[in-house]
Amino acid sequence: MRELIDNGATATLDPVEQIEQGIERIHAEVAADLLARLHAQAPAFFEQAVLDLLLAMGYGGAEGRASRTQLTNDGGIDGIIDQDALGLSRIYVQAKRYALGSSVQRPEIQGFVGALHGNKAGQGVFITTARFSTGAQKYANEVPTPVVLIDGPKLASLMIRYGVGVQVRRTVKLVEVDEDFFE
């Protein structure tokens, strides 16, 4: 075991904990880089990246059906993706690149819910590179139409988890003694 000093506090970590802590630091750096790169891309790229993520998460039905709406005059919907294999249920997506450090406010969520109703949609996902204000979160939780909010940190975390926009740099194999072998 080795002692690490972090913010003035001394902690004793075993080697596995050290590896886990290192992976967390790497993921935090990659997440920040992902958000910066997403923000630097064109809106169409961001919308497609969001749909790619939802497909990687298993949405899109058996054929991986997802479609991006036209870039302008899209009626408040940026993409539509099948939730099930038969295409009976669809998820409507709003994908917005907002400045890092900014917040999506309640009126934007209200507008999205209005777009959902206008499309006779039963549910939606609003994904952004920014954060959501307390008012936006409260509104999304209280409105009868299910709306999932995914902010920048959650977006980056999901991209890492599902391998969208990232690649595996190295795989580490940890071993331990197999107690069953020696019985």
Identify the function of each model-found stretch:
Residues 1-183:
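Mixed-charge (Asp/Glu-Lys/Arg
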